Amino acid sequence: DKGGSFLNGKDAGPAFQIQGEYAGKRTGVQVIALGDGKFRAVIHKGGLPGAGWDKGKKIELNGAATTTGADFPKANDWAVRITGAKLRLTVPGADAQTLEVVDRKSPTLGSDPPKGAIVLFDGTDAKQFKPGKITKDGLLEQGANSVRHFQSHRLHVEFRLPFMPKARGQGRANSGCYLQGRYEVQMLDSFGLTGKNNECGGIYTIKAPDVNMCL
Protein backbone atom coordinates (compact mmCIF):
# COMPACT_ATOMS: atom_id res chain seq x y z
CA ASP A 1 0.00 0.00 0.00
CA LYS A 2 1.00 3.68 -0.01
CA GLY A 3 2.50 3.36 3.47
CA GLY A 4 4.75 0.55 2.38
CA SER A 5 3.18 -2.46 4.13
CA PHE A 6 3.37 -5.81 2.34
CA LEU A 7 2.05 -9.27 3.20
CA ASN A 8 3.51 -10.97 0.13
CA GLY A 9 7.21 -10.85 -0.67
CA LYS A 10 6.47 -10.89 -4.40
CA ASP A 11 4.74 -7.52 -4.07
CA ALA A 12 7.44 -5.92 -1.93
CA GLY A 13 9.99 -5.27 -4.68
CA PRO A 14 13.76 -5.87 -4.70
CA ALA A 15 14.30 -4.47 -1.18
CA PHE A 16 12.64 -7.55 0.29
CA GLN A 17 15.12 -9.78 -1.52
CA ILE A 18 18.10 -7.77 -0.24
CA GLN A 19 16.94 -7.62 3.38
CA GLY A 20 17.99 -10.69 5.30
CA GLU A 21 20.85 -12.58 6.88
CA TYR A 22 24.21 -13.38 5.35
CA ALA A 23 26.64 -15.82 6.96
CA GLY A 24 30.30 -16.70 6.57
CA LYS A 25 32.79 -18.79 8.54
CA ARG A 26 33.48 -16.13 11.17
CA THR A 27 31.06 -13.28 10.53
CA GLY A 28 27.31 -12.71 10.22
CA VAL A 29 25.59 -9.71 8.66
CA GLN A 30 21.96 -8.65 8.96
CA VAL A 31 20.74 -6.23 6.29
CA ILE A 32 17.71 -4.11 7.17
CA ALA A 33 15.58 -2.42 4.48
CA LEU A 34 14.74 1.19 5.39
CA GLY A 35 12.61 2.17 2.40
CA ASP A 36 13.32 4.35 -0.63
CA GLY A 37 16.30 2.21 -1.63
CA LYS A 38 18.13 2.66 1.68
CA PHE A 39 19.57 -0.12 3.86
CA ARG A 40 21.54 -0.67 7.04
CA ALA A 41 24.06 -3.51 7.43
CA VAL A 42 24.67 -4.79 10.97
CA ILE A 43 27.92 -6.78 11.21
CA HIS A 44 28.31 -9.39 13.96
CA LYS A 45 31.74 -10.83 14.73
CA GLY A 46 31.68 -14.61 15.17
CA GLY A 47 28.39 -15.20 13.37
CA LEU A 48 24.71 -14.32 13.44
CA PRO A 49 22.77 -13.81 16.71
CA GLY A 50 22.12 -17.21 18.22
CA ALA A 51 24.59 -18.79 15.77
CA GLY A 52 28.08 -17.73 16.79
CA TRP A 53 27.90 -14.01 17.53
CA ASP A 54 30.25 -13.19 20.41
CA LYS A 55 27.79 -10.52 21.71
CA GLY A 56 30.50 -7.90 21.32
CA LYS A 57 30.17 -4.50 19.69
CA LYS A 58 28.33 -4.49 16.37
CA ILE A 59 29.44 -2.51 13.33
CA GLU A 60 26.72 -0.69 11.40
CA LEU A 61 26.97 0.68 7.86
CA ASN A 62 24.43 2.64 5.84
CA GLY A 63 23.99 1.84 2.16
CA ALA A 64 21.79 2.16 -0.88
CA ALA A 65 20.42 0.00 -3.65
CA THR A 66 22.29 -0.50 -6.92
CA THR A 67 21.25 -2.14 -10.17
CA THR A 68 22.71 -5.45 -8.96
CA GLY A 69 22.09 -5.29 -5.20
CA ALA A 70 23.34 -2.74 -2.66
CA ASP A 71 26.53 -0.89 -1.73
CA PHE A 72 27.61 0.24 1.74
CA PRO A 73 30.52 2.72 1.48
CA LYS A 74 33.61 2.15 3.60
CA ALA A 75 33.50 3.42 7.18
CA ASN A 76 36.35 2.77 9.65
CA ASP A 77 37.80 0.36 7.05
CA TRP A 78 34.62 -1.77 6.93
CA ALA A 79 32.60 -1.97 3.70
CA VAL A 80 29.84 -4.15 2.25
CA ARG A 81 28.70 -4.90 -1.29
CA ILE A 82 25.74 -7.15 -2.07
CA THR A 83 25.39 -8.77 -5.47
CA GLY A 84 22.55 -11.22 -5.84
CA ALA A 85 22.64 -13.71 -2.95
CA LYS A 86 26.26 -12.96 -2.02
CA LEU A 87 27.72 -10.31 0.26
CA ARG A 88 31.31 -9.12 -0.04
CA LEU A 89 32.67 -7.86 3.28
CA THR A 90 35.81 -5.73 3.52
CA VAL A 91 37.40 -6.26 6.93
CA PRO A 92 40.13 -4.03 8.43
CA GLY A 93 43.49 -5.80 8.68
CA ALA A 94 42.28 -9.03 7.07
CA ASP A 95 41.28 -10.54 3.75
CA ALA A 96 37.84 -9.74 2.37
CA GLN A 97 35.12 -12.29 3.12
CA THR A 98 32.30 -13.62 0.96
CA LEU A 99 29.07 -14.34 2.84
CA GLU A 100 26.00 -16.07 1.44
CA VAL A 101 22.36 -15.41 2.19
CA VAL A 102 20.81 -17.82 4.69
CA ASP A 103 17.16 -18.48 5.52
CA ARG A 104 16.99 -19.49 9.16
CA LYS A 105 13.81 -20.92 10.68
CA SER A 106 12.85 -21.72 14.24
CA PRO A 107 13.49 -25.41 15.02
CA THR A 108 9.97 -25.61 16.49
CA LEU A 109 8.24 -24.07 13.45
CA GLY A 110 5.37 -26.33 12.38
CA SER A 111 6.10 -28.90 15.07
CA ASP A 112 3.34 -31.25 16.23
CA PRO A 113 1.77 -30.48 19.62
CA PRO A 114 3.09 -32.71 22.41
CA LYS A 115 0.90 -35.42 23.89
CA GLY A 116 -1.82 -33.96 26.09
CA ALA A 117 -1.47 -30.43 24.70
CA ILE A 118 -4.53 -28.22 24.31
CA VAL A 119 -4.70 -26.94 20.73
CA LEU A 120 -6.33 -23.52 20.70
CA PHE A 121 -6.05 -22.85 16.97
CA ASP A 122 -5.15 -25.04 14.01
CA GLY A 123 -6.55 -22.96 11.17
CA THR A 124 -9.88 -24.79 10.90
CA ASP A 125 -12.01 -22.84 13.39
CA ALA A 126 -11.75 -20.13 16.05
CA LYS A 127 -14.14 -21.59 18.63
CA GLN A 128 -11.50 -21.44 21.34
CA PHE A 129 -11.44 -17.63 21.11
CA LYS A 130 -13.87 -14.81 21.84
CA PRO A 131 -14.26 -12.97 19.62
CA GLY A 132 -12.68 -15.42 17.24
CA LYS A 133 -12.34 -14.71 13.52
CA ILE A 134 -10.32 -16.39 10.77
CA THR A 135 -8.87 -14.40 7.89
CA LYS A 136 -9.32 -15.49 4.28
CA ASP A 137 -5.78 -16.89 4.47
CA GLY A 138 -6.71 -19.17 7.37
CA LEU A 139 -5.02 -17.14 10.09
CA LEU A 140 -6.40 -16.07 13.46
CA GLU A 141 -7.36 -12.40 13.42
CA GLN A 142 -5.90 -10.15 16.12
CA GLY A 143 -8.01 -8.97 19.04
CA ALA A 144 -9.01 -12.47 20.17
CA ASN A 145 -9.00 -13.76 23.76
CA SER A 146 -8.89 -17.45 24.64
CA VAL A 147 -12.13 -18.77 26.11
CA ARG A 148 -10.20 -20.95 28.54
CA HIS A 149 -8.05 -19.51 31.31
CA PHE A 150 -4.61 -20.87 32.20
CA GLN A 151 -2.21 -20.61 35.12
CA SER A 152 1.28 -22.11 34.75
CA HIS A 153 1.70 -23.20 31.12
CA ARG A 154 3.92 -23.34 28.05
CA LEU A 155 2.50 -21.60 24.99
CA HIS A 156 3.58 -22.25 21.39
CA VAL A 157 2.65 -19.41 19.02
CA GLU A 158 3.52 -18.98 15.35
CA PHE A 159 2.99 -15.61 13.69
CA ARG A 160 3.91 -13.65 10.59
CA LEU A 161 4.75 -9.97 10.28
CA PRO A 162 4.16 -7.59 7.36
CA PHE A 163 7.16 -6.10 5.58
CA MET A 164 7.15 -2.37 6.44
CA PRO A 165 10.52 -0.93 5.36
CA LYS A 166 9.56 2.72 5.85
CA ALA A 167 8.33 2.24 9.41
CA ARG A 168 10.57 2.51 12.47
CA GLY A 169 10.57 1.13 16.00
CA GLN A 170 7.15 0.32 17.44
CA GLY A 171 5.51 1.29 14.16
CA ARG A 172 7.02 -1.69 12.36
CA ALA A 173 4.31 -4.39 12.51
CA ASN A 174 3.63 -3.86 16.20
CA SER A 175 1.42 -6.33 18.07
CA GLY A 176 1.62 -8.60 21.08
CA CYS A 177 0.40 -11.70 22.87
CA TYR A 178 -0.90 -11.14 26.39
CA LEU A 179 -0.43 -13.93 28.93
CA GLN A 180 -3.02 -14.00 31.73
CA GLY A 181 -4.09 -10.54 30.61
CA ARG A 182 -1.03 -8.91 32.17
CA TYR A 183 2.26 -9.96 30.56
CA GLU A 184 2.66 -8.84 26.95
CA VAL A 185 5.11 -10.75 24.78
CA GLN A 186 6.09 -8.40 21.96
CA MET A 187 5.31 -9.38 18.36
CA LEU A 188 6.86 -6.91 15.92
CA ASP A 189 9.58 -6.54 13.32
CA SER A 190 12.74 -5.83 15.29
CA PHE A 191 14.98 -7.62 12.79
CA GLY A 192 18.59 -6.54 13.17
CA LEU A 193 17.98 -4.46 16.29
CA THR A 194 19.37 -4.84 19.82
CA GLY A 195 16.62 -7.03 21.29
CA LYS A 196 15.09 -4.91 24.07
CA ASN A 197 12.03 -5.65 26.21
CA ASN A 198 9.84 -3.72 23.77
CA GLU A 199 11.13 -5.69 20.76
CA CYS A 200 10.20 -9.09 19.36
CA GLY A 201 10.13 -11.79 22.05
CA GLY A 202 10.55 -9.37 24.94
CA ILE A 203 8.14 -9.20 27.88
CA TYR A 204 7.11 -5.56 27.64
CA THR A 205 8.77 -3.35 30.32
CA ILE A 206 9.90 -6.49 32.21
CA LYS A 207 12.50 -8.58 30.37
CA ALA A 208 14.45 -8.47 27.13
CA PRO A 209 14.60 -11.65 25.02
CA ASP A 210 17.65 -13.85 25.59
CA VAL A 211 18.50 -13.35 21.91
CA ASN A 212 16.82 -11.36 19.14
CA MET A 213 15.54 -14.12 16.88
CA CYS A 214 13.30 -11.99 14.69
CA LEU A 215 14.05 -13.66 11.35
How would you name each of these model-derived features?
Residues 3-9, 14-16, 34-38, 42-215:
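Carbohydrate-interacting regions of secretory-pathway proteins
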Residues 16-20, 27-28:
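Mature N-terminal, pre-catalytic/accessory segment of carbohydrate-active enzymes
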Residues 1-7, 25-28:
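Charged, amphipathic alpha-helical segments
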